Every structure is written in structure tokens, then in C-alpha cells.
């Protein structure tokens, strides 16, 4: 009938944080309930970056598809299992998880902090410092600045990779839609905690 069929673009959950135990420090020893929401209520959590993933796995527990696992202190998404249902997005108290187009070569600013660059460097060695190098380099208008934080518009990004090249801290990464970063790290999904919660009930 002359109508074009819209192409379906699969989506996937994406965690905007790389603040593993190798890149951040602890401000204090948290001894409360092992829950992100609980830890958030105590001085925004124990990590030096108060914007980053706390690693207690509320998102992994909430995911009905076991698509989220914890490794090296932060959450990771296995896109082969993720259905982009969005439950994890609503669960994260730091608002770190976003549903984005699923592209094996996607580029992303894996950071959500809003500190000035100097403060960011003190709290996380791989965070966005707001230098604007990526913003000035992008020829396609795909990168904007939200204060000191660079943001990539996935709909405009052409995956040229220039932003990753100029990023001085490694905050911009590529190809993490497959959920295979830190594959050599021990993984834990939310399944054990789910079982424990069922037993308590």
C-alpha cells in the first residue's frame, strides 16, 4: 500500500559506571543491609564516588531474566539475556542504568558524576572530568555537555570512535553492549539473594 515498514531497533540496558574497586576507594566501611537503596541512605553510600555504582546488586536481584551480574564491585549487563524491560532502570537509586539501542559497536560515556574535573580525579580514576575534548571533536553533533558531564546521543552517533581516542581518562568506551567486559572477573547474579529472600519470606 506504499507504507514503509518501520525497522525494529533492539534495545538493551546499559550501566553508566566503570567505578570498579580498582578505580574508586571506600570512604567508610558499610555494615548495614546489603542493598543499594539502604546504603544510599547513609551518606550516599560508602564509595568515594557518590554518583557511582555501589555494587550491592539491587538491579541484579530485580532482573527477572538474570541479565545483570556483579563483577569487580559494579553491575554489568549481559545483553544476550537482557530484554530491555526497564525494571533495573527503576531499581537503581543512582539512576545509572539506561535503555539504549543495542549496537555491538556503540560508544558510551560510562559515568554519571557532576563534579568538577579535579574532584572527579580524586574520587575515580576513570570518570568524566568535563574537559569537553569529545564534545569539540565530534563532527556529528552526537555529544552534548550536561554541566561537567559529556553525554552521547545514541541516535546521532555514527560510531566513528574519535571521542574515545581523545578522552583522557578512558570514560568513553565502545562495544560494551555485549556485556562481555570483565569476563575474566568472578561473576555473581542476583539469583543467590533472590533465593535467600524467598527463604526469609
For each predicted feature, which ranges?
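Ferredoxin-type iron-sulfur electron-transfer modules and their immediate structural context
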Residues: 1-137, 166, 170-173, 177-201
Amino acid at each position: 500500500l506504499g507504507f514503509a515498514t518501520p525497522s525494529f531497533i533492539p534495545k538493551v540496558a546499559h550501566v553508566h559506571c566503570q567505578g570498579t574497586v580498582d578505580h574508586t576507594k571506600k570512604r567508610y566501611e558499610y555494615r548495614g543491609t546489603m542493598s543499594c537503596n539502604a546504603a544510599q541512605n547513609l551518606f550516599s553510600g560508602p564509595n568515594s564516588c557518590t554518583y557511582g555504582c555501589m555494587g550491592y546488586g539491587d538491579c541484579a536481584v530485580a532482573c527477572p531474566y538474570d541479565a545483570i551480574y556483579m563483577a569487580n564491585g559494579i553491575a554489568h549487563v549481559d545483553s544476550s539475556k537482557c530484554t530491555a524491560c526497564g525494571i533495573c532502570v527503576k531499581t537503581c537509586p543512582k539512576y545509572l542504568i539506561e535503555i539504549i539501542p543495542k549496537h555491538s559497536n556503540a560508544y558510551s560515556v560510562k559515568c554519571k558524576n557532576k563534579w568538577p574535573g579535579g574532584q572527579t580525579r580524586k574520587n575515580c580514576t576513570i570518570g568524566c572530568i568535563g574537559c569537553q575534548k569529545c564534545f569539540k571533536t565530534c563532527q556529528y553533533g552526537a555529544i552534548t555537555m550536561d554541566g561537567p558531564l559529556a553525554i552521547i546521543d545514541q541516535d546521532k552517533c555514527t560510531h566513528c570512535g574519535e571521542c574515545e581516542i581523545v578522552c583522557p581518562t578512558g570514560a568513553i568506551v565502545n562495544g560494551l553492549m555485549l556485556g562481555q567486559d570483565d569476563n575474566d572477573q568472578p561473576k555473581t547474579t542476583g539469583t543467590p539473594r533472590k533465593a535467600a529472600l524467598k527463604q526469609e519470606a
